[in-house]
Design a protein with these regions (language model features):
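Transmembrane beta-strand segments that form the barrel wall of outer-membrane beta-barrel proteins
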Residues: 82-86, 334-343, 385
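Surface-exposed loop/interface segments of Gram-negative outer-membrane beta-barrel transport/assembly proteins
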Residues: 1-47, 83, 87-185, 201-318, ...
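Short glycine/threonine-rich loop-to-helix capping motif typified by GTGT followed
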Residues: 348-352
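Short Gly/Pro-enriched turn/cap motifs at secondary-structure boundaries
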Residues: 54-58, 312-313
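Predominantly transmembrane beta-strands of Gram-negative outer membrane beta-barrel pores used
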Residues: 1, 17-18, 54, 62-88, ...
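One face of beta-strands
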Residues: 117, 356-360
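Transmembrane beta-barrel domains of outer membrane proteins
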Residues: 66-70, 104-106, 189-191, 203, ...
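Alpha-helical support elements that line or immediately flank enzyme active sites
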Residues: 62, 186-192, 206-208
Length: 415
């Protein structure tokens, strides 16, 4: 047999009778015995497919209602949706409920004035076992579990072998996460056709994200084959409350003028400004050592074992931009651009940068001699020069000098 060593170099781990039980995939259990590194544990022979015992098939349901209509000067669309998704674990809970609202409308307020609205809202509520995301990786724990380890002892309690947590018990009894999120985006746009060829466009986009997460991590008791409690794991128990909110704003205003003169001269001029900003805040409160685990509200935890921390940041980019484009006879093109960007990532005295650009093009393919040759359907020669800024890799507050705190010195610099 492949599992049998007969040259005397090792002490046999299994007898011939035990190897036969393995071959038969027997569910027979032998009492505690000396069997190598697992001395003191019962001896098992039946192979267990832990992946199959723990992981099932997810389920997803989708419901949608759509309404649309309009008239001569307006149009609208409304979409409502609900999605319920059940995760793949067979133990514990993993249910995610999501709700959607999508709305679009366009209204011609006056003959030359149009307002467009695009709204999107999504809310979700997910309840799932904290064993999926908190503490030890549950998939690593499944991998470490011996394939012949039973899930339950004869008393029907989750069985623990070799000191490793039972993955099913972690999912079922290890605690819960309740995560609620809300995400809304409102996009407003106003277009005014002032005169022939000239329009003003204003756009305001607001995005708001909120998250409220309640996390409990519970102690679990390990039981041996005789249903004796042998140890407590995942201690101390704990509860956390996490809040997060993000508010993003993007405002743009620009004028765009396009005019053709005598069918040979095309002029396009655009000038505008924009503002983009984001505010982020996050707060977490935690308590540990709860006397009971039925209700793990924060106020019921130990006041001596509590932590609270927060973080937040804010950034802004303001810009001015302009572009002038002139085309003659649809063959000769020259264009100039310039923009100024001010970023909050830089010191106030060095916050702004100016970035010009120019390019020229010759559509050789439109020349009569090139058309007669018939070599190319389209051929363009182009040359350009431009400057651009880059703030990637620069932290939000890198320009601010750090302050060192000490118990013995004034907290300024390194002195």
């Amino acid at each position: 047999m492949a599992l049998e060593i007969t040259d005397g170099s090792f002490t046999p781990e299994y007898t011939r009778d035990q190897l036969e039980l393995i071959r038969q995939n027997s569910d027979q259990v032998l009492p505690d015995a000396e069997w190598g590194r697992w001395t003191g544990y019962p001896q098992f022979f039946k192979d267990q497919d832990w992946n199959d015992m723990l992981i099932g098939n997810g389920n997803m349901q989708n419901y949608n209602v759509n309404i649309s209509g309009g008239g001569e000067r307006y149009s609208y669309m409304l979409s409502l949706g609900h999605q319920r998704e059940e995760g793949i674990p067979k133990f514990g809970e993993d249910v995610n409920k999501r709700y959607f609202i999508r709305a679009k409308s366009s209204v011609e307020i006056f003959k030359n004035l149009t307002y467009d609205l695009n709204l999107a809202y999504e809310a979700s509520n997910r309840d799932y076992s904290s064993g999926l995301t908190e503490g030890q990786n549950i998939w690593e724990l499944i991998y470490k579990t011996r394939s012949w380890t039973p899930m339950y002892n004869p008393s029907g309690t989750f069985y623990t072998f070799e000191g490793f947590d039972n993955p099913a018990q972690v999912l079922e009894d290890g605690g819960m996460v309740n995560k609620t999120t809300g995400n809304i985006t409102v996009n407003n746009q106003l277009r005014w056709k002032v005169i022939d060829g000239l329009q003003l466009v204003g756009q305001a986009v607001i995005r708001k994200y909120d998250m409220d997460e309640n996390v409990t991590n519970k102690k679990i008791t390990n039981y041996d084959w005789d249903n004796n409690a042998v140890r407590e794991k995942r201690t101390p128990n704990s509860a956390e409350r996490r809040y997060q909110k993000t508010l993003s704003k993007n405002f743009t205003l620009y004028a765009d003028y396009k005019k053709n003169f005598n069918d040979r001269h095309d002029l396009s001029v655009m000038v505008g400004t924009s503002h983009e900003s984001e505010n982020y805040d996050r707060f977490t409160a935690k308590r540990i050592n709860f006397d009971q685990q039925e209700n793990m509200s924060l106020q019921l935890g130990s006041a001596q074992d509590q932590n609270a921390w927060s973080e937040g940041n804010q950034w802004t980019i303001n810009s001015f931009f302009s572009r002038v484009n002139y085309t003659f006879a649809n063959k000769y093109v020259i264009e100039g651009t310039i923009r100024a960007d001010g970023s909050s990532r830089f010191d106030p005295d060095h916050r702004w940068g100016w970035f010009p650009g120019v390019n020229a093009a010759w559509r050789v393919g439109e020349e009569g001699f090139m058309k007669r040759l018939g070599w190319f359907e389209d051929l363009k020669v182009r040359a350009s020069y431009g400057e651009m800024g880059n703030q990637s890799g620069i932290g939000l507050y890198d320009y601010i000098q750090l302050i060192s705190l000490s118990n013995d010195y004034y907290p300024f610099g390194a002195g």
